[in-house]
């Protein structure tokens, strides 16, 4: 008979990975209080000899989606939570079934409560700054070092969920409306422009293509080109045909309105003002691919990490999920990619465990 112990953790976390009081119960509606998360975070990794099956870098929609499945698979997993998620300034979340109009913060809090039901999950509230191969191990493991340098962790598999960082305008009062009157994603918040005066802030590249995405909601669109970018003749002709107004060579310096997200005016450098109800900005972003680069993962021309259908990168045992691997920036896609990576890793771990057990007979 095969002696099969795939569920063993390698650290003291109980025999099942689920609190005994919850075995056999529906855990979907459990509400774990913040104290539980705090205790787990304070119980950071004390023994560097512990080898986790999976290290997840990033605790947004994709990272936590992967974590909850790995918890249910009883896999010893560590999550590195480096701080705010991309949409942490948004007031409401849209397009995610069951969470319409809830806040991203509420969603993340609920996601954490789901994840932290599983004792095989550990949390480190630090940013990972370095990943390298474990030179003392022949099993292709990874060493992860955090910003403080105090936490060095070993893992068999990596899920990188570091996402992207949006470029935001340096405009007076912008912060007051960011996520509440001013947004960047048409698919997430374009509905908010319905039959309203829309101002689009952009540096120019792909401007008209971006503006066209809103025509299903509003035809009252003014595009403000920031900086010195010159539109192509085709863009100008398309804009004129579609009734999209263009303001050039006159950067926005101020947004006026009420603190409740009610925008009233766009004020430009030359003193002119324009009526507006809603702002969308398209100023580019930075792909947070530094760790993927360290590992030698192949990137595309825009800096996104290339992945297979299972979210695996071009480097063995390294997966990339969420906004890091695609320009389809939508929370449903992010969560789905995390689940795909978790399932793929679990299947490979199980396959390897069965193979090793049989070879020992």
Question: Predicted regions span which residues?
Answer:
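FAD-site-proximal beta/loop scaffold in flavoenzymes
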Residues: 176-192, 283-330, 340, 347
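A Rossmann-like FAD-binding core segment of flavoenzymes
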Residues: 109, 115-147, 152-155, 218-304, ...
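Short glycine-/acidic-enriched loop or helix-start segments at secondary-structure transitions
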Residues: 66, 89, 133, 169-171, ...
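A conserved FAD-binding loop/helix module that cradles the flavin
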Residues: 210, 324-361
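Short, well-ordered coil/turn residues at beta-beta hairpins
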Residues: 161-163, 168-170, 201, 282-283, ...
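FAD-binding core/adjacent interface of flavoenzyme oxidoreductases
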Residues: 2-55, 122-196, 269, 278, ...
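Active-site glycine-rich loop that binds ribose-phosphate moieties when present
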Residues: 180-187, 200-210, 232
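Beta1-alpha1 glycine-rich phosphate/pyrophosphate-binding loop at the start
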Residues: 52-109, 202-229
């Amino acid at each position: 008979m095969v002696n099969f112990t795939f569920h063993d953790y390698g650290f003291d976390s109980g025999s099942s990975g689920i609190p005994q009081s919850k075995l056999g119960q529906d855990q979907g509606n459990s509400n774990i209080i913040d104290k539980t998360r705090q205790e787990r975070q304070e119980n950071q990794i004390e023994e560097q000899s512990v080898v986790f099956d999976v290290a997840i870098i990033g605790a947004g929609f994709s990272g936590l989606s992967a974590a909850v499945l790995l918890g249910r698979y009883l896999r010893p997993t560590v999550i590195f939570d480096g701080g705010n998620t991309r949409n942490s300034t948004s007031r409401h979340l849209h397009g995610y079934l069951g969470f319409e109009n809830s806040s991203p913060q509420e969603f993340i809090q609920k996601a954490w409560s789901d994840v932290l039901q599983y004792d095989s999950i550990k949390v480190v509230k630090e940013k990972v700054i370095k990943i390298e191969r474990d030179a003392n191990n022949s099993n292709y493991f990874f060493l992860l070092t955090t910003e403080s340098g105090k936490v060095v962790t070993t893992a068999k598999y990596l899920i990188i969920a570091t996402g992207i960082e949006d470029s935001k305008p340096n405009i007076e009062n912008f912060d007051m409306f960011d996520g509440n009157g001013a947004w960047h994603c048409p698919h997430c918040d374009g509905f908010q422009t319905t039959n309203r005066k829309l101002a689009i802030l952009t540096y120019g590249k792909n401007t008209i293509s971006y503006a066209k995405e809103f025509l299903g909601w509003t035809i009252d669109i003014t595009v403000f080109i920031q900086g010195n970018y010159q539109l192509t003749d085709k863009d100008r002709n398309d804009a004129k045909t579609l009734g999209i107004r263009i303001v050039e060579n006159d950067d926005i310096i101020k947004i006026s309105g009420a603190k409740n997200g009610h925008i009233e005016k766009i004020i430009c450098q030359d003193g002119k003002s324009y009526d507006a109800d809603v702002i969308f900005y398209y100023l580019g972003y930075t792909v947070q691919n530094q760790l993927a680069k360290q590992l030698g993962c192949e990137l595309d021309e825009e800096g996104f990490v290339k992945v297979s259908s299972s979210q695996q990168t071009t480097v063995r045992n390294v997966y990339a999920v969420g906004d890091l691997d695609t320009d389809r920036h939508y929370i449903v896609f992010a969560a789905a990619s995390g689940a795909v990576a978790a399932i793929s890793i679990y299947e490979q771990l199980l396959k390897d465990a069965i193979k090793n057990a049989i070879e020992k007979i």
